[in-house]
Every structure is written in C-alpha cells, then in structure tokens.
Amino acid sequence: MNTGTYAQTHETILKNGKELFLKEGFERANLREICRLSGVTTGGFYRHFKDKADLFSALVEPAIQGLQEQYSASEKMCFTVLENSGIDEIWKVSAEALEDFVSYIFDHLESFKLILCCASGTKYAEFTDWMVEREIKDMYKTCELLGKKGITVRRLPPKELHMLTHAYFSCIFETVLHNFKKKDALNSMKTLADFFSAGWRKVFGLGED
C-alpha cells in the first residue's frame, strides 16, 4: 500500500494512469488496475480524482493549454503581418508557425499520444475538430482582412472548408500516429506547408505569386 505524502501519491497515480492509458487506451484502461499499480484503494483514488476521466484530463490539459497559448501567439503574429505586409509574407509566417506548432507537440509527445491515440471515450476524442473549428475562424478573419485590402477571396462552402482544414490537421497529426522522430516530423512540415499553401492559393483564388 502506498505510504507516501498526498503529493507523492498524486504523482504516482498520474504516472501509472498515463502508462496504462498509453498501453490500453482510455476505454480499456481499468481503474482498479491503476489503483493496484499505485498502491491505493479506489477510495484513496477518489481523494485525488473524481473518476477515470478526471485523471485523463489532468494528464492532457496542461499540454493542450500550452498549445492553445502558443496558437494564440501565432494567430496574433500572423494577423499583424497580414495587416502590415502583403499576402506573400503570410505564407512564410504561417510555415514558421506550423513548425512551432509541431515542435511543441513533440516536446509534449506523450500527452499528445494520449490525445490523438488513446482518447476514445473522452471529450478529447474531438480534439482534431476543435483545432479545425479554430482554424476556420482564423480563415474567415483572414478573408475579411484581405477584403479590406481590396484582395478578392473566393468563399468556399462551409463543408468544403471543414473537409480541407480537417485534412490539413490530419496530415500534421499523422506524425504522432506513425511515430515520427521530431526531426523527421519538422522536415515533413516543410513539404506539408508547400503543398497546402499552393492548394489554399488555388481554392481561394489568390494566384500563384
């Protein structure tokens, strides 16, 4: 039986929960097994977490919050560039933001493996769609800013825009699903940025330059 302090026991439960979630996935991971590995009773577990879902949240929320903060900073930078420079500069800045995004994911790889590979049965199974919806809001804002500059942007039907944006994030997250090394993932983002920037230019009617 665990005889450590509250903080030590808390960390032990987090450690064993993470290992079992990574191995079994959220749905198959057994709460009693987490308790057994951690040397606590189920009653002892509930002094730390409301339930298995609460434990999962504790493991992934810090990484998600950090990613969202980085994403917000990238948004601000991209919109500032768009307001003060031409359309061409935004593709370069967006590619750099993509590399930062992926670098953060690989610096918190176990958390994102939990989110992308092991979250079925939790609200985090919708993580990709959360990112898609946020990106689409940014695209609409980008279109508005370009319109103010006198640049005409073709409006895509919402379902088409969702489909293409989902494909974009799916490609990014493939690097986690298929166990890329960080260096290889970052290298692949250069190809991904070239591919999608050319595609976005085409479908939005922004030309080749």
Segments from the language model and where they lie:
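Amphipathic alpha-helical segments that line or abut small-molecule/effector binding pockets
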Residues: 88-110, 162, 166, 170, ...
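Amphipathic alpha-helical packing segments from all-alpha helical-bundle domains
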Residues: 100-107, 122-148, 159-166
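Amphipathic alpha-helical segments used for helix-helix packing
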Residues: 75, 79-84, 93, 99-122
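Alpha-helical structural segments
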Residues: 12-19, 23, 33, 37, ...
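Short hydrophobic/aromatic patch on the recognition helix
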Residues: 39-49
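Hydrophobic/aromatic-rich alpha-helical bundle segments in the mid-to-C-terminal region
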Residues: 2, 114, 146-195, 204-209
